[in-house]
Amino acid sequence: MNSNTHAKSSNFHQSELDKFAALANRWWDADGPQKPLHALNPVRLEYVSTRLELAGARVLDVGCGGGLLSESMARLGAQVTAIDLAPELVKVARLHSLESGVQVDYRVQSVEDLAAEQPGSFDTVTCMEMLEHVPDPTAIIRACASLLKPGGKLFLSTLNRTPAAFALAVVGAEYIARLLPKGTHHYKDFIKPAELAAWLRNAGLQLEDVSGMLYEPWRNRARLSSRTEVNYLAYAVKP
């Protein structure tokens, strides 16, 4: 399926969409190809929920994939809209939402298009493990900023561009331990926290925090950490 038929935006790599669409049917399999993501999800949720009252908040999840974080936030009372450019992933997310009885408004739509339609509409925007997979992450951040209400919060997670990240997230996870399919990540697209901070500032957002997220494959568990050499989370506020 040509995943870009449902969105105007060209800010994506078709190969990236196809790669993740191929994982759609096993997205919710905690022991499947997305096993590390299942381990990271509680940490992502903790990071968001300790900085925001999710109950009643209007939240947008950008690059929602099969809906792991979207459903988790909805379970805590958030009114969640979730978007992705891969129809296969959105279909899986919708089906799981029906099965679980958790209400999420899933859409095949780009964040840029949604920003043009509904600026200033959300209390919070989350964009997790996505920026390193698009051609122009700065455009994603600008669109996310546009979608926030004044005082709204943007939560992000991505990978640092360091030798440690290359060794662990690419070589170790994809080729040695085979925790992820080969080709999941491209080191050149990883993002240093200083770069992310500049992009947020240029989008009119104020960076409030950067925290490391440590994945322990031998336990299949993740936790927040002061170390940001590999995975890290950040949040910023719209004045």
UniProtKB/Swiss-Prot annotation:
One of its GO terms (biological process) is methylation. It is an enzyme of class 2 (transferase). Pathway: Cofactor biosynthesis; ubiquinone biosynthesis. Its EC number is 2.1.1.222, 2.1.1.64. The keyword Translocase does not apply. It catalyses: a 3-demethylubiquinol + S-adenosyl-L-methionine = a ubiquinol + S-adenosyl-L-homocysteine + H(+); a 3-(all-trans-polyprenyl)benzene-1,2-diol + S-adenosyl-L-methionine = a 2-methoxy-6-(all-trans-polyprenyl)phenol + S-adenosyl-L-homocysteine + H(+). The keyword Hydrolase does not apply. One of its GO terms (molecular function) is 2-polyprenyl-6-hydroxyphenol methylase activity. It comes from the Bacteria. S-adenosyl-L-methionine binds at residues 44, 63, 84, 128. Keywords: Methyltransferase, S-adenosyl-L-methionine, Transferase, Ubiquinone biosynthesis. O-methyltransferase that catalyzes the 2 O-methylation steps in the ubiquinone biosynthetic pathway. Belongs to the methyltransferase superfamily. UbiG/COQ3 family. This is Ubiquinone biosynthesis O-methyltransferase. It comes from Xanthomonas euvesicatoria pv. vesicatoria (strain 85-10) (Xanthomonas campestris pv. vesicatoria).
